[in-house]
Amino acid sequence: SRHQENIDWKVVANEKQDDISIHFAFIKATEGVSTADKNFKKNWQGANSTNIVCGAYHYFIATKNGKDQARNFIKTVELKNGNLPPVIDIEELYGANPVDMRLRMKEWIQMVEDYYHIKPIIYTSADFYNQYLDGYFKDYPLWVAHYFEKNKPRISSPWLFWQHNNTGHITGISEKVDFNVFYGDEDAFEAILIK
């Protein structure tokens, strides 16, 4: 996102730490009803020009109309075969009633799923999930942020991605980055990509 400023994606793609390389990246595309991340186009082109599998995410504002937020994402992001599914990032209520927040999320999810013909991934923290989303949107893949846990995030639902660290360092990016892992093998990873 704009927080990482200039990223050298070719260097990132060749980075290896303890025999672990960067296989995928989620890039912030949009926020709310009208904001596009100022570095999205540059990052999207840069990352897609490497062997890194790319996904785009929308930072969801719980008090704003879900369809308007979906339109913002759709007009900004062109997904192609081999990309990760679109992501809705929900982290705060911003004073919204949880029921209204879930209705707005549902609007975004349905509109984006209809447009891209793939189920979006829901990104949230373990605490937010347990408090407001547990039992809802069960048919959608979950990407959960729960930092510095030993083996896995502490949630009862199955998860697809786990953001386990928000203070990572990667050559090619001057600012701290979030580290994520995929729950599955290479075949399972390939199966979730846009076809």
Question: Which residue ranges define each predicted feature?
Answer:
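Substrate-binding cleft of extracellular glycoside hydrolase catalytic domains
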Residues: 1-118
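Short secondary-structure transition/capping segments
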Residues: 69-79, 99-111, 130-138, 162-178
